[in-house]
Design a protein with these regions (language model features):
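Conserved small-residue
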Residues: 1-240
């Protein structure tokens, strides 16, 4: 019979305030630099998660879905914020209204207002929303590790991350959906091929770096006859 062990060292809770690591192609880029992480390597929190997944090396994947609603931009929204649904009047929880309170710690509420306010991205939180919208990998067996945002698997309203069957010597595959109207199904194919020894890795998140940070993302395009094809989402693809 399952029973909760209240004080087990592996018990931990991830919230919208938890420190997390950014990996993959967006790590260290201008897209994710904020006042909190001027180098663009870390962020805070995961929110409105829905669906899940897992890896052959024993980590848990959680999917950030309806996260755009927690932010507000009262200025000029960039195209990605307009398309994905960041609001212009208030966040759905109005967390930004608690900014400036005497109990606020490290801009924990200020960051939900992504309006441009400073001279550069490292002076404000204009890029805070860009640190959300990812598959987040968690090592459930090591409570000292940070949750890791795998930016290579795409940024959208993630719903589920289902793995294909791992076959030694072949790339690993995960299938994902965007849980919004008229959106897409996605497939991630790792560059690295599966080594069955990695199922018993001593460092699960490093193994995640191997298979989840480098690869190819595809979107499904369906035809009227019910067939379809996978389109590579790359600037090297002339269709894109």
């Amino acid at each position: 019979r399952w029973q909760v062990v209240d004080n087990d060292p592996l018990n931990r809770r991830f919230t919208t305030a938890s420190r997390m690591e950014i990996t993959g192609p967006l790590r260290g880029t201008d897209h994710v630099k904020t006042k909190y992480s001027t180098g663009g390597t870390h962020c805070r929190g995961t929110n409105n998660n829905c669906g899940n997944g897992y890896t052959p090396w024993g980590t848990y994947l959680t999917c950030e879905e309806n996260w755009p609603g927690i932010f507000v931009n009262k200025g000029t929204r960039p195209e990605d914020q307009r398309r994905i649904g960041v609001g212009t009047s208030s966040g759905q929880y109005k967390w930004e209204t608690a900014a400036g309170d005497s109990t606020e710690v490290a801009d924990e509420f200020t960051r939900f207002d992504v309006t441009v306010k400073g001279a550069s991205a490292t002076d404000d939180y204009r890029n805070e929303a860009s640190t959300y919208g990812y598959i987040v990998e968690i090592d459930p067996y090591n409570s000292s590790t940070l949750a890791t945002k795998r930016t290579a698997l795409g940024r959208f309203r993630h719903e589920g991350c289902a793995p294909g069957l791992p076959v030694a010597g072949k790339p690993l595959v995960w299938y994902m959906g965007d849980d919004s109207n008229n959106e897409y199904l996605y497939k991630w194919v790792s560059t690295a091929v599966w080594d069955a020894a990695d199922a018993n890795t001593a460092n699960p998140l490093a193994t995640g770096d191997k298979y989840l940070d480098k690869g190819t993302l595809y979107a499904a395009r369906f035809k009227d006859d019910g067939s379809g094809e996978w389109m590579e989402l790359s600037l090297d693809n002339p269709v894109i």
